Amino acid sequence: MKSFFKRIKPFLAPIIITLVALLLFHVVFMLGYVPSDSMEPTLEAGSLILGLRIHGELEKEDIIIFRHDGTYMIKRIAANEGDVIVHNGQPQTVPAGCFYVLGDNQSNSHDSRYWEDPYVKLEDVMAKLLLPIDPSLK
């Protein structure tokens, strides 16, 4: 039994470090892909992005990765809870725990302006943008 542990001992540290790094990446970070030009010029189509899952309070202008109708999306927060927005020509107050989001390329973005329920709920936010990665690196 001792010889078995002597043989695997040199491999234990790299294996443990790799497992801890993978766990940390899964819990703290999120890797994403920008599929369209809806966030240009800020994020180019084809860019990879790194998001922070543990993001604290979200504010206007933050770029978030979230789920909407079963799809991951990347948009900028345009209004927070309590803010008044105009949706379909009517003033509305953003509900508690929700955000109103827009793409930076508003002429080519499917965002809160077009949804029946225009709000992103906090529980649907997966991450806050931490770092865009140059699309030429893909």
What are these regions (language model features)?
Residues 1-138:
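Extended hydrophobic leader/signal-anchor segments used for secretion and membrane insertion
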